[in-house]
A protein has these predicted regions:
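N-terminal positively charged helical leader segments and presequences
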Residues: 1-87, 185
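Short beta->alpha connector loops at strand-helix junctions that form conserved
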Residues: 51, 75-76, 118, 144-145, ...
């Protein structure tokens, strides 16, 4: 039998919708069975709220959370609605501890594939890139200071649990990230639609087989000149049809998977 969620615990969790409170508490909300399952596995869950109607269905998840030391509550429909960031709550909401790490942790273990988000402002794009980096086997993701907050609810949802799978460093200056990459012997590529290097050519020539850091710029402005200059090459994704361009998350997926393919072929 789960303890009922008190008004005080619901109020605390609800305040995590505000960035200032997330930062001061060192906590954020994850919602949905998949994301929460990954959070529990990572040991990040502090509190778990289960809708009364769904508690029996998610009993295994509740047991895992309890075994990991989390507090698990039976929550009313009103409480779940208040905590949810969607119009159709899934009935599973967790208060999680911050998961971001310092750049030395994320980049200090000879990584082979890293994605750097440079002033990426759309949380859906950011979360999707985290998910894609995880799927492609990347070793880390880095957020620049100007990028959207990793714990933004839309970013957390878009990552679908992947933010609990790999090291993510936030608030890192791009020049500092590149410097750490150089110490590890990585090549640095800047993704840009106007780049003078073609991704297919880099793939065919073996240029992507080396350990690689990708820089992905702002959705509207791309990468500034001074950051493009830090890269070994500015690379464009070829457009073979009539589309004007790819959106940021799609372009990042193509680039990351091209690197992953080249690196697997070399092994």
């Amino acid at each position: 039998m789960l303890a009922p969620a008190s008004k005080a615990r619901v109020a605390h969790a609800r305040r995590l919708h505000r960035r200032t409170f997330r930062e001061s508490a060192g906590e954020f909300l994850a919602e949905g069975p998949q994301a929460v399952r990954e959070a529990v596995a990572a040991g990040a869950v502090r509190e778990l709220f289960l809708a009364s109607a769904d508690a029996a269905r998610h009993r295994a998840l509740a047991d895992d959370a309890l075994a990991a030391g989390a507090r698990v509550y039976d929550a009313s429909d009103a409480a779940v609605t208040a905590l949810s960031g969607t119009t159709t709550p899934q009935g599973v909401i967790a208060v999680c501890a911050r998961v971001d790490v310092g750049p030395e942790v994320a980049l200090g273990t000879a990584p082979r594939l890293v994605a750097v988000l440079v002033a990426v402002r759309d949380p859906g794009n950011a979360g999707t890139i985290v998910r894609t980096a995880d799927a492609a086997g990347a070793d880390a993701v880095v957020f620049s200071p100007e990028s959207v907050e990793l714990a933004n609810p839309k970013c957390v949802r878009a990552s679908t649990g992947s933010l609990f799978h790999l090291p993510i460093a936030t608030g890192v200056e791009v020049a500092a990230a590149v410097a750490l990459a150089r110490l590890s012997g990585m090549r640095v590529f800047a993704a840009d639609g106007g780049g003078d290097h073609d991704l297919d050519d880099e793939l065919d020539s073996g240029g992507l087989a080396a350990p690689t850091m990708w820089l992905f710029g702002n959705e509207a402005r791309g990468l500034p000149t001074e950051l493009r200059a830090l890269a070994d090459a500015v690379v464009r994704v070829p457009i073979h049809g009539r589309a004007e361009s790819l959106n940021l998350a799609a372009a990042a997926a193509v680039c990351l998977y091209a690197s992953a393919r080249a690196q697997r072929a070399r092994r």
